Amino acid sequence: MELEYESKRPLHIPYAGPILLEFPLLNKGSAFTEEERANFNLHGLLPEAVETIEEQAERAWRQYQEFKHDIEKHVYLRNIQDTNETLFYRLLDGHLSEMMPIIYTPTVGEACEHFSDIYRRARGLFISYPNRAHIDDMLQNATKQNVKVIVVTDGERILGLGDQGIGGMGIPIGKLSLYTACGGISPAYTLPVVLDVGTNNPQRLNDPLYMGWRHPRITDDEYYEFVDEFIQAVKRRWPNVLLQFEDFAQKNATPLLNRYRDEICSFNDDIQGTAAVALGSLIAASRAAGTQLRDQTVAFLGAGSAGCGIAEQIIAQMKSEGLSDEEARARVFMVDRFGLLTDKLPNLLDFQSKLVQKSELLANWDCNSDAISLLEVVRNAKPTILIGVSGQPGLFTEEIIREMHKHCARPIVMPLSNPTSRVEARPEDIIRWTEGAALVATGSPFSPVNYQDKVFPIAQCNNSYIFPGIGLGVLASGAKRITDGMLMAASRALADCSPLANNGEGALLPDLADIQQVSKRIALEVGKAAQLQGAAVVTSSDALQKAIEHNFWQPQYRSYKRTSF
């Protein structure tokens, strides 16, 4: 039976008694009214007091504060989510800045590593390769019937932690929690999915409590055929769904995105979402410095799908500001474990080959021509922006940062690797090495830095600024695909919200407390771009704004009326 969740009218439901209390989307706990307790056979199953959601949230907040360790707080919040989703989101709504690092990065990384140890209750769908003949049946088994947003992972590249098998399910669960908390997408319309294709992690395979398929990962044709079976089943079940690929390994992420982005409304947050939030941050930083992105030179440490995705977005923005493709690409330097990507390097991936530097342009460099290091790139190319997506801690050394500062008065340094333990440099070190001159944005949350009696806010270049607004914009506009223009619109809308760019002071990115308004602004621009590019039916801006407000779910209890199946 499909329930109508969007309006504020009374909700007619057929469930009663203990079954109703076990339904997280519908359970109100102690907030069921006397009339509802009588109508739904709840008398005796609840304490006498009828409470408001505010009173419930206050109790939950007090309980939350009793936990000393972040992983304990994560488990506690997940328990509330699996018991009473409306209360869970009301609690987040009042404490989002404190709780976002708990429900998502960095704590979700630890939760993924220990998924089988802390497992309490199933959420979402676990689609395993041994049961591949029954994918359609599995989708029919989903408790949510009108799914509008799916986040799917195969668990192979979880944050910077690598292959976690089905433990990777923690990422889709956390991501969809933020679609709701930040982007107002009703939890009734979201579905986390993990594709269990085995694992190559010996710790998981040898763990007697591991709950996934104990088998080495399937690869090549077997893997791609299985993913395709899943995609086709999703299209049959929910043809208008938004599908987000999450934490797939580099070798699979780009091919899957390229294959399906025009077949089903889909995007890869690690590639496109990371690129969009990074670009928005860089546009804002350039404005704050009184320049344009076309005037910057960018060095990357990490040339995987995420780094190359960011680079391509930067190049697109530079071109929109007047540079040719060749001029823009000459300003972007990609460094991986083998050194600077040049046209002499063999065995490059397709998406890397577009970002190589021409060897003849490096002829006058003072460097080791066989493997040009990041330090040598900084000395010779003199970048004004340094971006880390390597997943390796400490690689932005003091020597590299000080060398960058020699030729750049206001360097922009973005160590984006997650979780915190994998960050290329800590913000306090970057601030100190540049005597307070650097603009810093990180991938994980960091506290403000105090240096020489001045406080430096550290922007978290968090994809949560982008993907909830994209999702809301897609739902409100009815977009059938996500175009590059829609992603660019999201980046520019985020830059427009920068306190530093707008006021000359404050953080590079808006406060997380304002993220719902940021998401609405991004949704509007994404929806407009979808209409301009033919991905959605054209409406007026007013109609689009009304659709955004209509789709924006609030964690409030509705009254219930009893009905039969």
Curated annotation (Swiss-Prot):
GO annotations of cellular component type: cytosol
Superkingdom of the source species: Bacteria
InterPro entries xrefs: Aminoacid_DH-like_N_sf, Malic_enzyme_CS, Malic_N_dom, Malic_N_dom_sf, Malic_NAD-bd, Malic_OxRdtase, NAD(P)-bd_dom_sf, NAD_malic_enz_proteobac
Keywords: Metal-binding, NAD, Oxidoreductase
SMART domains: malic, Malic_M
Note on how the cofactor is bound: Divalent metal cations. Prefers magnesium or manganese.
EC number: 1.1.1.38
Record-annotated active site: Y104 (proton donor), K175 (proton acceptor)
Quaternary organization: Homotetramer.
Family, similarity comment: Belongs to the malic enzymes family.
Name the record gives this protein: NAD-dependent malic enzyme
